[in-house]
């Protein structure tokens, strides 16, 4: 999966189209990501040991990875990702627009 935890992404379709947010977690088996402040759903909960009072909780729900696009930290634009190998053999992500390495080296 091209998107990692901590990346800044742009939502490209759906009800939150145009919003930017940081990736909280990645679910590679489901090909989904959870983005901070995007796709907020209300969940009705009952009282339990953790929460003595039940109620309605707002939390971010997962988005399919095809609905988000990575924002390059160098050119600050949404971009597709290319992969390349460095001289030491490491595989890194590269911005297709500015050709800079995206991975935190």
Swiss-Prot record:
Swiss-Prot/TrEMBL keywords: Ribonucleoprotein, Ribosomal protein, RNA-binding, rRNA-binding
GO CC annotation: ribonucleoprotein complex; ribosome
SMART domains (alphabetical): KOW
Pfam families: KOW, ribosomal_L24
Gene3D superfamilies in alphabetical order: 2.30.30.30
Secretion signal span: none
Record-linked InterPro entries: KOW, Rib_uL2_dom2, Ribosomal_uL24, Ribosomal_uL24_CS, Ribosomal_uL24_KOW, Translation_prot_SH3-like_sf
Any one Gene Ontology BP term: translation
GO MF, any single term: structural constituent of ribosome
Known function: One of two assembly initiator proteins, it binds directly to the 5'-end of the 23S rRNA, where it nucleates assembly of the 50S subunit. One of the proteins that surrounds the polypeptide exit tunnel on the outside of the subunit.
Record's subunit section: Part of the 50S ribosomal subunit.
HAMAP family in the cross-refs: Ribosomal_uL24_B
Family per record: Belongs to the universal ribosomal protein uL24 family.
Protein name: Large ribosomal subunit protein uL24
Annotated organism of origin: Dictyoglomus thermophilum (strain ATCC 35947 / DSM 3960 / H-6-12)
Gene that produces this protein: rplX
